[in-house]
Amino acid sequence: MLKPLGDRVVLKVQKEEEQSIGGIVIASNAKEKPTTGEVIAVGNGRILDNGQRVEPEVKVGQSVVFDKYAGSEVKYEGEEYLVIRENDIIAVID
């Protein structure tokens, strides 16, 4: 399993539908980049300048909204993930 370092978070991105409500197929270059995902793994937290560690606010299993230009795409064991910094997460979905 991927284990993120520091304040990084591994997400399984929730893919968008490939068809519109009217049944029209949307070209891949016309689709918006997904901005929601499920937290798969969380690092140990950010370290401040004074050496203190700030615990992550998100937890494994939570669904989150993140900045659409955030992170790095990673392929691991045939699955695609997104590794982002915790501060690129905008909200937790209840």
Swiss-Prot record:
Coarse class of the protein's main subcellular location: cytoplasm
GO BP field: chaperone cofactor-dependent protein refolding
GO molecular function terms noted in the UniProt entry: ATP binding; metal ion binding; protein folding chaperone; protein-folding chaperone binding; unfolded protein binding
Gene3D superfamilies referenced in this protein's UniProt entry, alphabetically: GroES chaperonin (2.30.33.40)
Assigned keywords, A-Z: Chaperone, Cytoplasm
Pfam families assigned to the protein according to its UniProt record, in alphabetical order: Cpn10
Localisation per UniProt entry: Cytoplasm
NCBIfam families recorded: PRK00364.1-2, PRK00364.2-2, PRK00364.2-4, PRK00364.2-5
Name under which the protein is recorded: Co-chaperonin GroES
Species: Ligilactobacillus salivarius (strain UCC118)
Species lineage: Bacteria, Bacillati, Bacillota, Bacilli, Lactobacillales
